[in-house]
UniProtKB/Swiss-Prot annotation:
Function as written in the Swiss-Prot or TrEMBL entry: Allows the formation of correctly charged Gln-tRNA(Gln) through the transamidation of misacylated Glu-tRNA(Gln) in organisms which lack glutaminyl-tRNA synthetase. The reaction takes place in the presence of glutamine and ATP through an activated gamma-phospho-Glu-tRNA(Gln).
Transmembrane region(s): none
Subunit composition and interactions: Heterotrimer of A, B and C subunits.
The name this protein goes by in its record: Glutamyl-tRNA(Gln) amidotransferase subunit A
One Gene Ontology molecular-function label: ATP binding
Pfam families for the chain: Amidase
Native source species: Borrelia garinii subsp. bavariensis (strain ATCC BAA-2496 / DSM 23469 / PBi) (Borreliella bavariensis)
């Protein structure tokens, strides 16, 4: 049996029936990590995870399970999520050497249930990027074809699951940073409703949109981990309860489900391979009895402008804390305070991060804040969110491709931010309206690259979305892509 090709639920079954040791499972993932270092998915694989595995094996041997429903389940973690006594760098030179003094709430909940955190994964610096190339540790490559990008910003978390270096991983999703790399690497990528998972311990990028998300090969695994990590948290005032009676996930026919298709996301705008795959996806759903209705939401035409107005403003505010005075790397030169700030941030932040900070500060400057930032917030709250709320009164889910484009070649669009930002046009919708969304692997092109399809659900109806996605995978025969 290949121990590195297991779902979490299968690991649970093998461990509880004592057919396999947790240590042997973790060792299999460690060996896969050693064989696939060129992908650059991990920043660090935790060697002490093997010691924890031995300890849990002893607990199982002595029948000392306590309340550990996730015992022995290996999970990789994006490097912007805090794990006590582990490095937290957000893949930035400016934070190298920083050790987190506390656990994020999601991490604490996983540890308390018996999960084993096996490593920190690579990412675009401070979660800013859509290719996985903007990291001080180097680019993460696509396991399906190493000449192409994995997508970002949670590229490392996607890569380690896609290459079976981990069965499950945590990422963060601000505008599609979980779903895009999931689509590019042929796995599942899930973003919960805004507030569904506590953001305490997640390094902030754009606080209005940030959300921890999951990568997996299994819908059941996503639902299991969501069940044990979701819920309100006193450390995060935006957190909400989302658990409902759709868990365990329901097996239902697709017959009669009402799906919406947004007219403005025209197939004419898509890469031809994406367009043909999306057309087939729609046909497959219709053949199973689902109803698909085309709706017009004109505000989609400037949804990227809204996102790339609000998110840089929040980023410029959130990243102001990285001064070099309290934590992270520090210049030792004798400089004035202003010169210290200037040199420190100029030397230790990447071009993409500086680009977004400068844009955010510009949009907040006198005379422009009301013209751009305030206007964007007004349009979002008064037009976009109400329109989607109205749409969900008559439909169950929205379907789109995960991205209009296929993966870029490594380095090809490094200096073309507009093209890179355009890859987010479908995914930012869920972040702006606070809804749950998932990317399903649907097809592959002649280069072996994956094309994913996105399903967006109602806010706080995450398990309903996961149940529907499970049934789409089952009825369309998408397992094993």
């Amino acid at each position: 049996m290949d121990l590195s090709n297991l779902t979490l639920t299968k690991i649970q079954e093998l461990v509880l029936t004592k057919k396999c040791k947790i240590y042997d499972i973790l060792l299999a993932y460690k060996n896969n990590y050693e064989l696939n270092k060129d992908i650059n998915g991990y920043i660090e694989f935790f060697d002490d995870s093997l010691d924890i595995a031995k300890r849990y094996d002893d607990c199982l041997k002595n029948c000392e399970l306590e309340d550990l429903p996730l015992i022995g389940m290996p999970i990789a973690v994006k490097d912007n999520i805090s794990i006590q006594d582990k490095s937290l760098t957000c893949a930035s030179e400016i934070l190298k050497g920083y050790i987190s003094p506390y656990d994020a709430t999601v991490i604490k909940r996983l540890k308390n249930k018996g999960a084993i955190l096996i490593g920190k994964t690579n990412m675009d610096e401070f979660a800013m990027g859509s290719t996985g190339e903007f990291s001080c540790y180097g680019a993460t490559l696509n396991p399906l074809n190493r000449e192409y990008v994995i997508g970002g910003s949670s590229g490392g978390s996607a890569a380690v699951v896609a290459s079976f270096q981990a069965p499950f991983s945590l990422g963060s999703d601000t505008g599609g940073s979980v779903r895009l790399p999931a689509s590019f690497s042929g796995i599942l990528g899930f973003k919960p409703s805004y507030g569904g998972l506590s953001r305490y311990g997640l390094a902030s990028y754009a606080s209005s949109f940030d959300q921890i998300g999951f990568f997996s090969h299994s819908i059941e695994d996503i639902a299991l981990i969501l069940k044990h990590t979701c819920g309100a948290d006193k450390m995060d005032s935006t957190s909400v309860d989302i658990f409902d009676d759709f868990y365990p996930l329901k097996t239902e026919p697709l017959q009669g489900k009402n799906l919406a298709l947004i007219k403005e996301l025209s197939e004419d705008l898509m890469d031809k391979n994406v367009a043909s795959s999306f057309a087939k996806f729609k046909f497959d759903l219709l053949s199973k009895g689902a109803n698909i209705k085309e709706v017009s939401i004109e505000e989609i035409n400037f949804i990227l402008s809204i996102y790339y107005t609000i998110s840089p403003v929040e980023a410029s505010s959130n990243l102001a804390r990285y001064t070099g005075l309290c934590y992270g790397k520090r210049i030792s030169e004798n400089l004035s305070l202003n010169d210290f700030y200037f040199k420190h941030r100029s030397n230790f932040l990447s071009e993409e991060v500086k680009r977004r900070i400068i844009l955010g500060n510009y949009l907040l400057s006198e005379g422009y804040d009301a013209k751009y930032y305030a206007k964007a917030c007004e349009i979002l709250q008064n037009l976009i969110i109400p329109k989607f709320n109205k749409l969900f009164e008559s439909c169950d889910f929205i379907i789109t491709p995960t991205s209009f484009v296929k993966p870029f070649r490594v380095g090809l669009d490094f200096d073309d931010p507009v093209k890179m930002y355009y890859s987010d046009i479908c995914t930012v919708i869920a972040n702006l309206i606070g809804a749950p969304a998932i990317s399903l692997p649907y097809s592959k092109d002649k280069e072996g690259l994956s094309i994913g399809m996105q399903i967006i659900g109602r806010s706080k109806k995450d398990f309903e979305l996961l149940s529907f996605s499970k049934n789409v995978i089952r009825e369309l025969g998408l397992n094993g892509i």
